[in-house]
Regions:
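Pre-Walker A adenine-sensing motif
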Residues: 32-44, 377
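N-terminal accessory nucleic-acid engagement/regulatory domains that precede
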Residues: 1-17, 277-287
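Conserved lysine of the Walker
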Residues: 60-61
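Hydrophobic anchor at the beta1->P-loop junction of P-loop NTPases
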Residues: 52-54
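Walker A/P-loop NTP-binding motif
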Residues: 64-77
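Pre-Walker A (Motif I) flank of P-loop NTPase domains
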Residues: 46-50
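Conserved helicase motor core of SF1/SF2 NTP-dependent helicases
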Residues: 77-82, 91-135, 339-388, 393-576
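Conserved helicase NTPase catalytic core signature
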Residues: 171-388, 397-402
Length: 576
């Protein structure tokens, strides 16, 4: 057995093997076609969205990686500052890339799965098919907005706040008006907390002024605007008022909001009332359950709705706050020293450090520049804007995940690689136009790779039988490896897969089962584990179970059948 480096991501090795094995007269024209198609994609310098389509074995991933290297060379000055994000389908794929292209790690490239894109959210939990579909749907935008609004509280009864011995009534009407003013701003929750508090404090200051400044003769209030402003200051500095604002409009953390939402069936029912019980149940998880891959996009959406949240590295944030506090201490010392040192008017005209810089500015001047690489800084910052984004197996991204990715690339300079015939996620892509339309309209270009140089024609013939059942009009790449290349065997259901898997030195074999069955047998992989990977020998177990395992079951089976480069064994009946 080999390490991850032996797992074959569809790459140049397959092309070279095919070229060495090919003996037909059309080889020259086919290689020319491959080179022409790939070169156009790799060297396309347009600064927009490019979709690269192609069936199994057409080298989509290899082209995407070559394009990454090309862009990093041509646009080095821009991309060395902004970084490049490469999203892959699984950790094995990303580890392979980091091994075969180690130089990418030195040029500001961040490798990630979409489920790991939000800092601090580590997807370990297993998500049900219905859960993935629901969490991936764009309807979650409305559900999450409702979840945030739950924290913007209006009390059922008036609350009496005692400030300097005076009882002030915080009525539901006043809170409702403050909430409406904050919401009208259209800004995120945490960022309008100050506006909410200001409206509330202003109302209480006016109420206080009415109590103590009323003219006994019925004239105008005896307090001046300055007096009312002082009352306002007394209200906002009152501990009770600060605590009340915390209750009515708390500072939120998107991860906490999502965890509290998903672990409370009652809250789910209130914010997702349009869903039936089964669908609502798919959102529920027990308190303390681990994050799943679908959760990252939801946390990211909440971060957008909540605002005032820079990322996850609280340690870095705490360090910065300490730096600012230390800098303020230095300025305070300088200020007090200066006031005692000034002997005459001319000295007072001398500019000192505290006259031209505040604490935050001084702290920033002392900060060690570029102490982390571009990739490290980008990886930990949810507001980072990447110069370019490359997405492999992009057909798997849900509507919510596309929203998250698009936020990472405001310029929309992206290379999107995928094949909708292989979409395994129930929330994945059916149409590039429908998926990309909300973000870029029709402003994207599409390239198609037409030559399958990895999968032997014999093996593709089996896969194409399945493809015809769900996408009969889908284009199929011309198989370069024809003739006697490739072995296909069919075995009865119940056959021991390990007994029929070839065991030859230097060849990598795998047994593929339905995702729901992979925990039953040690050593096997589920369909979702083999996305983007190639193997010499493949055994596919129980095709009908794979089909029944997911709403995208036919696509999953198509993926499983097209992972082999030398031999394919099918245990059990094929559909149709």
């Amino acid at each position: 057995g080999g390490g991850v480096g032996d797992l074959g991501v569809v790459g140049e090795s397959a092309l070279f093997r095919a070229m060495r094995a090919a003996r037909t007269g059309r080889m020259g024209s086919i290689v020319s076609t491959i080179q022409r198609e790939q070169d156009v994609i790799i060297r396309d310098e347009s600064r927009g969205v490019m979709v690269v389509e192609g069936g199994p074995g057409t080298g989509k991933t290899a082209v995407a990686l070559h394009r990454a290297a090309y862009l990093l060379y041509v646009w080095r000055e821009v991309l060395s500052r902004t970084g490049v994000l490469i999203l892959g389908p699984n950790s094995a794929f990303l580890e392979y890339i980091s091994q075969v292209l180690p130089e990418l790690g030195e040029t500001g490239v961040v490798l990630s799965t979409v489920g790991e894109l939000f800092p601090g959210v580590v997807p370990v939990g297993v998500e049900s098919v219905v859960g993935r579909e629901v969490k991936g749907s764009v309807e979650m935008v409305t559900i999450l907005a409702r979840a945030v609004r739950r924290y913007q509280v209006v009390p059922d009864e008036p609350v009496v706040l005692v400030v300097d011995g005076v009882g002030l009534e915080v009525s539901p009407g006043l809170v409702r008006a403050a909430r409406a003013a904050a919401r009208r701003s259209g800004r995120p929750h945490n960022e309008v907390r100050g506006l909410f508090a200001d409206f509330l404090a202003s109302g209480l200051a006016r109420q206080w002024a009415g109590l103590i400044g009323a003219d006994p003769l019925g004239g105008e209030n005896l307090l001046s605007a300055g007096d009312v402003a002082e009352l306002y200051d007394d209200v906002v500095s009152d501990v009770g008022f600060v605590g009340l604002v915390d209750e009515l409009w708390p500072v939120l953390d998107p991860r906490v909001v999502l965890a509290e939402l998903l672990s409370d069936r009652g809250v789910i029912a209130r914010v997702a009332g349009d869903y039936d019980e089964v669908t609502q149940g798919a959102l529920f998880r027990e308190v303390g359950d681990l994050w799943s891959a679908s959760d990252a996009a939801l946390v990211d959406e909440l971060a957008e709705l909540i605002g005032g949240f820079s990322g996850v590295d609280e340690g870095v944030g705490d360090g910065w706050r300490r730096q600012v506090a230390d800098a303020q201490g230095v300025l305070d010392v300088l200020s007090s020293s200066a006031s005692s040192d000034l002997d005459d008017v001319s000295d007072a005209e001398v500019l000192s450090a505290f006259d031209v810089v505040d604490a935050e500015g001084l702290a920033r001047r002392q900060e060690v520049r570029e102490h982390r690489s571009v990739a490290d800084r980008a990886r930990g910052d949810i507001r980072w804007s990447y110069g370019h984004v490359i997405i492999d197996e992009a057909q798997e991204l849900s509507a919510m995940e596309w929203r998250m990715v698009m936020r990472r690339c405001p310029t929309k300079w992206m290379t999107i690689v995928g094949d909708t015939a292989q979409t395994g996620s129930p929330a994945g892509v059916d149409s590039w136009a429908e998926t990309l339309g909300p973000f870029v309209g029709d402003r994207f270009v599409t390239h198609r790779l037409s030559v399958n140089y990895r999968t032997p024609a014999r093996i593709m013939a089996v896969a194409e039988r399945v493809l015809g059942l769900f996408a009969p009009d889908a284009p199929v790449g011309v198989a370069l490896r024809g003739g006697d290349d490739g072995v296909v065997r069919f075995c009865a259901a119940g056959t021991d897969p390990w007994a029929v898997l070839p065991r030859e030195e230097g060849r990598l074999g795998v047994v593929i089962v339905a995702d729901s069955r992979k925990g039953e047998t040690p050593g096997v992989l589920g369909v979702s584990d083999v996305k983007g990977l190639e193997f010499d020998d493949v055994v596919v177990v129980d095709p009908l179970v794979i089909v029944d395992d997911s709403p995208q079951g036919y696509q999953d089976l198509f993926v499983a059948l097209t992972r082999a480069t030398r031999s394919l064994v099918v245990i059990g009946e094929l559909p149709g």
